[in-house]
Amino acid sequence: MAGALLGALLLLTLFGRSQGKNEELSLYHHLFDNYDPECRPVRRPEDTVTITLKVTLTNLISLNEKEETLTTSVWIGIDWHDYRLNYSKDDFAGVGILRVPSEHVWLPEIVLENNIDGQFGVAYDSNVLVYEGGYVSWLPPAIYRSTCAVEVTYFPFDWQNCSLIFRSQTYNAEEVEFIFAVDDDGNTINKIDIDTAAFTENGEWAIDYCPGMIRRYEGGSTEGPGETDVIYTLIIRRKPLFYVINIIVPCVLISGLVLLAYFLPAQAGGQKCTVSINVLLAQTVFLFLIAQKIPETSLSVPLLGRYLIFVMVVATLIVMNCVIVLNVSLRTPTTHATSPRLRQILLELLPRLLGSSPPPEDPRTASPARRASSVGILLRAEELILKKPRSELVFEGQRHRHGTWTAALCQNLGAAAPEIRCCVDAVNFVAESTRDQEATGEELSDWVRMGKALDNVCFWAALVLFSVGSTLIFLGGYFNQVPDLPYPPCIQP
């Protein structure tokens, strides 16, 4: 008994399913036996088919700056009314939805006008849903690669304005009319819809605004009614953290190394030039990396490229400064003469302004000792010539402190033997040579000090130029924000 009851229930279930399939099949034949998918669903030729459009973004895949290509994954919701597909579910056992292959139904043939890969249509021809009353809905997925003119002026602190332009490839503005869909609250969805639950956030770009608009272009003549475009705009802002960590910070640190060349001695011009040129080479590598990222355009120079060019110019100026300082530091009195004006500026004025004045000279220098030794030699010569003791000579020298003893000494030396005069001449020559060497050494020291003063001035100038220039360049990128447009945010918080 129980087995018979179970068998009866199974038969009823199979019969019900078969009956349901038969009802859908009957509905399909009822609707499509005399249906022509090539004809517009209008009763009169002058009537217009109203197309309701809704674009849902599921993933902003990428923006290729080099190729200026935007890749997006979307769902395109297209709804319209087809009077030829009108039916009542009461006549077909309550079948309220009929799923039909898209090639069996008239389609408005909406394509992406600004695609770049030749794929105008959707990625997958999903089934069309036919509802009671002749309402038709089609929700195909698509992956579009569209053109997007990239503005690289503030790269990597930039934002881009990309568009998705949809148009009916076959029908003009008088044959089909586009309107935006309406949500459950009755609000018009005049923007790209983003389902936060299904949306995958991009790691490089953030979507700020995604408004939509419908624009009708009038034809050039009365016989051409014109076209209608549905334009969705994606205003996206770059997330610069990747470029800050991997390019900007290393570039700033390497560029700052060029200032360390000033901490080398003024005479070490070769080492200073080596440091600066190595920094130049490193900056060239960074500039090459940026050139591989941005599009090949002459319309603008990216912010990061401008910064690299700026620091390369600073490094070049530092190399020139090192050469000039080395040239000044190695000058000698035999090749160059120092003007009093230049000496006053470089040895007195600039060191005092920069706080690098040399320590005051000790009054107890070696000159009096050398002078005393010279006087001692002369007194010894006179003692030998005149056969007088040293005490008497010193006593006489003290009596004639105003120079009378020098005159007497010269008179006595004039009458001395030639050998003694030769010795005195030799001593005078040695003393004169010593004085010349001391003067030359002081002159060389002055040239070195002047080179050091120039080096200090150029260091502070390079430091100020590097700091102010870097700050101004990057502040331009910081203030490059997306303007407050009269659109609601694309993704509601």
Curated annotation (Swiss-Prot):
All ranges on the Cytoplasmic side of the membrane: 265-272, 329-456
Record keyword Transport present: yes
Signal peptide region: 1-20
Pfam families, sorted: Neur_chan_LBD, Neur_chan_memb
PROSITE patterns linked: NEUROTR_ION_CHANNEL
Ranges in the topological domain labelled Extracellular: 21-239, 292-306, 481-493
Positions of transmembrane segments: 240-264, 273-291, 307-328, 457-480
Example of a GO MF term: transmitter-gated monoatomic ion channel activity involved in regulation of postsynaptic membrane potential
Cellular localisation: Postsynaptic cell membrane; Cell membrane
InterPro entries in the cross-refs: Neur_chan_lig-bd, Neur_chan_lig-bd_sf, Neur_channel, Neuro-gated_channel_TM_sf, Neuro_actylchol_rec, Neurotrans-gated_channel_TM, Neurotransmitter_ion_chnl_CS, Nicotinic_acetylcholine_rcpt
Catalytic activity: K(+)(in) = K(+)(out); Na(+)(in) = Na(+)(out)
Entry's Gene Ontology cellular component terms: neuromuscular junction; postsynaptic membrane; postsynaptic specialization membrane
Keyword vocabulary terms for this entry: Cell membrane, Disulfide bond, Glycoprotein, Ion channel, Ion transport, Ligand-gated ion channel, Membrane, Postsynaptic cell membrane, Receptor, Signal, Synapse, Transmembrane, Transmembrane helix, Transport
Positions of disulphide bridges: 148-162
Membrane topology: Multi-pass membrane protein
GO BP annotations listed: regulation of membrane potential
Glycan attachment residues as annotated in the record: 86, 161
Biological function: After binding acetylcholine, the AChR responds by an extensive change in conformation that affects all subunits and leads to opening of an ion-conducting channel across the plasma membrane.
Name of this protein: Acetylcholine receptor subunit epsilon
Gene (name only): Chrne
